């Protein structure tokens, strides 16, 4: 089993400010690369904040030039990076909650949220998911928030050969106990490594819980952020054993 370094970027988005969030994402990427991270995961809609009322205005095409700096830096740093943003499809006027996967090899793939929370359907349409990504000899399946509330979604990841389940979320203080129990259960029952990246501060009127985390296959919580705030939550696999650390971040405004 090869060494692997995963990181959840717990991040506090600036509401609706794509340019400012993009620059801060690049800053987080550079800081993560200093820790020799292989795979960096940002929260749900990290480039805009969770702002449904602004989503139609902020939605980007899947081939948007906005992501070019992320793609370029991911390749330069040799660090596969997943960022969140609202997406507009070429086929329709539908707005999707998306993740853009910028590979260490310069490639890009798109994952779109398949399962919506109650009320999200007023703005967003269900997406179609996406294929697991290959990282060395590991397969990583992506998820966006409500996707993981459907056990069939996690089981499908395992059936497609994934050993890591990486979910970009917005989880509130009230929702955290239930949601973290679900994720721990997938790690325990499906022998998945589960990486969860949550918002580090309020977004879209929600009081986010922070506490981004990683659970090793078997269900042991390896590492968790203490609470809210911007930080890196790192899980490292060495000779099959997982260890964790957290690093607080002080980002430029």
Predicted regions and their residues:
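Short polar catalytic/cofactor-binding loops
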Residues: 10-15
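Short beta-strand scaffold segments in enzyme catalytic cores
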Residues: 83-85, 97-101, 131, 212-214, ...
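CN hydrolase (nitrilase-like) catalytic-core segments centered on the catalytic cysteine
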Residues: 65-82, 149-231
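Active-site catalytic loop in hydrolytic enzyme cores
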Residues: 90-163, 173-175, 179-181, 238-253
């Amino acid at each position: 089993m090869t060494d692997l370094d995963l990181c959840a970027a717990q991040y506090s988005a600036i509401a609706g400010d794509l340019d400012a969030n993009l620059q801060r994402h690049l800053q987080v990427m550079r800081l993560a690369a200093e820790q020799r991270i292989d795979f960096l995961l940002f929260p749900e809609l990290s480039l805009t904040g969770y702002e449904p009322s602004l989503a139609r205005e902020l939605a980007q095409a899947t081939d948007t030039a906005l992501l070019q700096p992320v793609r370029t830096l991911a390749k330069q740093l040799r660090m596969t990076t997943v960022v969140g943003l609202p997406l507009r499809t070429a086929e329709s006027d539908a707005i999707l909650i998306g993740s853009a996967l910028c590979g260490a090899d310069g490639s890009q793939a798109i994952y779109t949220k398949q399962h919506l929370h109650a009320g999200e359907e007023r703005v967003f349409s269900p997406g179609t998911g996406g294929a697991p990504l290959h990282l060395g000899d590991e397969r990583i399946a992506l998820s966006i928030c409500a996707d993981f509330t459907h056990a069939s979604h996690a089981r499908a990841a395992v059936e497609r050969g994934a050993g890591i389940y990486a979910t970009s979320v917005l989880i509130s203080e009230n929702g955290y106990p239930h949601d973290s129990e679900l994720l721990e259960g997938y790690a325990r029952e499906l022998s998945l490594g589960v990486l969860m990246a949550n918002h580090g501060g309020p977004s879209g009127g929600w009081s986010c819980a922070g506490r981004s985390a990683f659970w090793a296959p078997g269900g042991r919580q390896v590492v968790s952020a203490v609470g809210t705030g911007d930080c890196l939550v790192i899980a490292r696999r060495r000779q099959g054993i997982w260890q964790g650390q957290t690093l607080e971040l002080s980002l430029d405004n």
